[in-house]
Amino acid sequence: MAVVKCKPTSPGRRHVIKVVNNELYKGKPYSLLLRKKSKSGGRNNNGRITTRHIGGGHKRAYRIVDFKRNKDDIGATVERFEYDPNRSSNIALILYKDGERKYILAPKGIKIGDTIISGLRAPIKTGNTLPLKNIPVGTFVHNVELKPGKGGQIARSAGSYVQLVAFDEEYATLRLRSGEMRKTQSNCRATIGEVGNSEHMLKVLGKAGASRWIGIRPTVRGTAMNPVDHPHGGGEGRNFGKHPVTPWGIQTKGKKTRKNKRTDKFILRHRRK
């Protein structure tokens, strides 16, 4: 994998930094694991904008990725790695010994032809999936479940991982990249190793049009708007003369937004500021 800085042959190329991976499959994705994916444009079922800065972008097909990894004690061979437009990490197409194919998140360090397996007593090897209670303390894992059997929810983006730091009766303690320490049931599953494509963070789009290709619309400053559009709008000059707020008048700097108090008891230490 190489990080390539483009030559400034035009203003749109001057700042572009690409991540080139020659291992990615150049053909079409596996058709049996594709589904139609429609765009919302950031609107809800009433047609109202609920998420700003979303719209347009290239058409995508959804790749069905196996986050549960619950096909136990059947070995699978890594056939190829593919680009997935719906996530920052790459995906791997694996072929089980019984002939079934599935997509999984491509872990860092595995190669085409490697064998991986899931199960209660799977070896501690990159790409294998097993319950947290059977994984040694200190191991880096990804695609970690929060509820047994629901499928991995933590550490799925490019280059991410969590570290297993302790066990306490029926719970395992995890240290997240953010610094948060949280508990989850020890019979939840996780995959050994880190998610691949960690160079994704070095990628620079380089121009506004590249953001439009991936469905991101412009972000306009509130102070550049009219008073009818934003609390910061209007007035002479650039000063808006009040504490910064959202377009709906809610404090925007430092205000806590977490509402899920039901799971607060599982968070031992909140993330670092």
From Swiss-Prot:
Any one Gene Ontology cellular component term annotated for this protein: large ribosomal subunit
Family, as annotated: Belongs to the universal ribosomal protein uL2 family.
Source organism, top-level taxon: Bacteria
Subunit structure and binding partners: Part of the 50S ribosomal subunit. Forms a bridge to the 30S subunit in the 70S ribosome.
Coiled coil found in the keyword field: no
Source lineage: Bacteria, Pseudomonadati, Pseudomonadota, Gammaproteobacteria, Enterobacterales
Record's protein name: Large ribosomal subunit protein uL2
Keywords: Ribonucleoprotein, Ribosomal protein, RNA-binding, rRNA-binding
Entries under InterPro entries matching the protein: NA-bd_OB-fold, Rib_uL2_dom2, Ribosomal_uL2, Ribosomal_uL2_bac/org-type, Ribosomal_uL2_C, Ribosomal_uL2_CS, Ribosomal_uL2_dom3, Ribosomal_uL2_RNA-bd_dom
GO biological process: cytoplasmic translation
Function field: One of the primary rRNA binding proteins. Required for association of the 30S and 50S subunits to form the 70S ribosome, for tRNA binding and peptide bond formation. It has been suggested to have peptidyltransferase activity; this is somewhat controversial. Makes several contacts with the 16S rRNA in the 70S ribosome.
Membrane-spanning segments: none
Residue runs in coiled coils: none
